[in-house]
Amino acid sequence: SFTNNKKGFNADWHYANSNTLLGMLNLYKASNDYTYQAFVDKFNQHVFDHYHFFKEQYCSLRIMRGAYFRLFRATMLDDTGGAALPLAETALNAKPQILHREILDQVLNHILNKQSRLADGTLCRPEPVEQTIWADDMFMSVPFLLNMAQLNKDSKLYDEAAFQVLHINHYLTDPRTNLCRHGWYNQTKELAPVAWSRANGWIVWAMSETLLKLPTNHKKYKKIKDTFT
């Protein structure tokens, strides 16, 4: 389990762990075996119980690669919308926790106000190549935005999620194959040479989440559905 992993990676604030935990939540929904939900709850509680210790390490002691450093580094979507999905997915049914909302609000603020964007508003990467769009960032932003739209009852977050789906897909789609490339470089206006299968999986996942959670009467729903199919 994540509690006895020697390196502690399985307990870390990381998008790979986030995806695994989402899988467990889906297993719980499919099997009604509460063991899966309990594991996710345990992970989330681990974040809350040790949050101030992790924050002290990073913000005061300047331990830049300490436990959960990405939660406080928050320089890209890997650190924010990608890693926070288990908290966002469970927030509607979770017991009220001040830290739960505090972390979600921090992440949402980063996506809306701090994350790098192109001039048209499309989310992009600050590095390793400035203003590069990656397929990763559709799943690291859109599912979180959809959950927060429901939690906050904020239709503008649905609009933002739909905008990112359509714009990221537009930039990354190779018209010759209709596959998404892994990246698009704003500096050269060129697609990356690779249509990475995992990246296409992220796109499919993010778009399917959108079709499941975006209100069907949303003005962009049909366009997203047509793009998906």
Which role does the model predict for each range below?
Residues 1-229:
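Glycan-recognition and catalytic cores of secretory/periplasmic carbohydrate-active enzymes
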